[in-house]
Every structure is written in C-alpha cells, then in structure tokens.
C-alpha cells in the first residue's frame, strides 16, 4: 500500500484563493434595500385599488400588483410586508378620505337631523365621484385581514359620527336602538343608494333615490 503524495501547492492554492476573495470583497457594501422613492407607495396603492376591484382581493397576488405598478416585489414589501398590510393601508387611507368628505359637510350650529342628512349626502356625493373606492370598501366589509390597529384608527376617524347618532337617538329622530345598529344601517342604506344610482335601473332620479333611502332611517 502506497501513501498518496500530497501536492504541496494544493493547500497553499486554496489559501491564496481565499485570501484573494477576501481582498476583493473587503469594503464592499451589502446589497442596498429598496429605496423609498417618492410616489412608489402611491403607485402601489392605486394599482392595488384597480386590481382588487376588478379581480377581488383574494384573487390578486402581490406579484401582479408590483408588476403592474412598475416596481419590484422588494419595493412593494418594503412598504407593505404582506398583502393584509397592503389591504389595511388602502382601506384606512380611503376611510380617512371618506371621513374628511363627510366631516366637511358638518356644521355644529345646525340641528341634529340636518347635520345627519348633510353627513350622509356628503358621503353619497363622495361615493358617486369615487365608485372604485366604494366597491373596495364594500369588499372589505367582512374581510378578515383588516387588523385591529386599522379598525381602531378607522373608529377614531368616525367617532364624532357615533356621537351624532347618539344625539339623534336622544332627540327621538331615530329609534332607540344601539348606535352600532344605526351605524350599520346607515352604511347599508347608503351603499344601496349608490348602487341604485349607478345602475340607473329604477327609473328614479338620484335625488329621489337619496330622499327615499334617507326616509328609511327616521323614526316613524
């Protein structure tokens, strides 16, 4: 049995190659994280809104959103770590927009019923101008991925409306039922009003649809 002769250069060659690799990478910066380029977040949200309302939230992968937004998936995940975070951010941004539109119509000097009507009409006017956003809010009504932090933020945006509903109950304008009941009914009725106006199937004018829809809210 003979002992295989060790090439004296083999070990040294590996060491020299390793040393060269270290020299070549020394001081080299790691791959940069995706940059927060102005406008990328908005592009992602706008694209998500368009795709969610066309194909549905569950049927729209984040890869398609990033592709159609013209950004990398790394950039999308830089802003939104997962799809639920993206859905929640879009939902909250639209809810804030709604709150601003509705609150803009409010005037503390008006009687409670007039304030109520102005707020609802403000939402309907906003909804007629933003049908895709209304469709997305409808999709999210029972979406399980909306986090509690987003729900709390939305509640804070509309807490004044809960107070207005409470005043309407106290004054006998609406039936003496829980605020949550009336908030849900307002949402359902206004969604129905917007759907009927968009469909044009009733033969009624938008004002007639709105007037008859609002009449369903008041105490008989």
Segments the model singles out, each with a brief description of its role:
Residues 43, 47, 51-85, 89:
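Helix-turn-helix
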Residues 127-145, 195-199:
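Amphipathic alpha-helical segments used for helix-helix packing
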Residues 40-49, 65, 90-98, 102, ...:
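Generic hydrophobic, amphipathic alpha-helix propensity
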Residues 96-99, 118, 125, 129, ...:
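Amphipathic alpha-helical packing segments from all-alpha helical-bundle domains
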Residues 57-58, 174, 202:
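Conserved hydrophobic residue
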Residues 1-29, 122-126, 159-170, 189, ...:
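C-terminal peripheral helix-coil segments that are non-catalytic and often amphipathic
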Residues 89, 103-129, 182-186:
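Hydrophobic alpha-helical connector segments
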Residues 54-55, 109, 130, 171:
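Short coil/turn segments at alpha/beta junctions that flank glycine-rich nucleotide-binding fingerprints
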């Amino acid at each position: 049995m003979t002992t295989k002769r060790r090439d004296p250069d083999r070990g040294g060659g590996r060491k020299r190659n390793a040393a060269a690799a270290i020299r070549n990478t020394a001081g080299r910066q790691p791959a940069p994280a995706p940059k927060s380029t102005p406008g990328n977040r908005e592009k992602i949200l706008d694209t998500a809104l368009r795709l969610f309302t066309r194909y549905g939230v569950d049927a729209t992968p984040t890869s398609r959103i990033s592709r159609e937004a013209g950004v990398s998936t790394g950039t999308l995940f830089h802003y939104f770590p997962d799809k639920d975070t993206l859905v929640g951010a879009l939902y909250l941004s639209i809810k804030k927009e709604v709150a601003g539109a509705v609150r803009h119509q409010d005037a503390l000097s008006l009687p409670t019923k007039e304030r109520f009507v102005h707020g609802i009409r403000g939402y309907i006017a906003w909804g007629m101008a933003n049908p895709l956003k209304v469709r997305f809010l409808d999709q999210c009504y029972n979406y399980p991925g909306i986090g509690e932090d987003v729900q709390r933020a939305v509640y804070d945006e509309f807490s004044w409306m809960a107070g207005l509903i409470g005043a309407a109950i106290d004054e006998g304008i609406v039936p003496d039922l829980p605020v949550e009941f009336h908030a849900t009914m307002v949402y359902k009725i206004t969604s129905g009003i917007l759907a009927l106006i968009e469909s044009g199937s009733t033969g009624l004018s938008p004002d007639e649809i709105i007037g008859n829809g609002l009449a369903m809210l008041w105490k008989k």
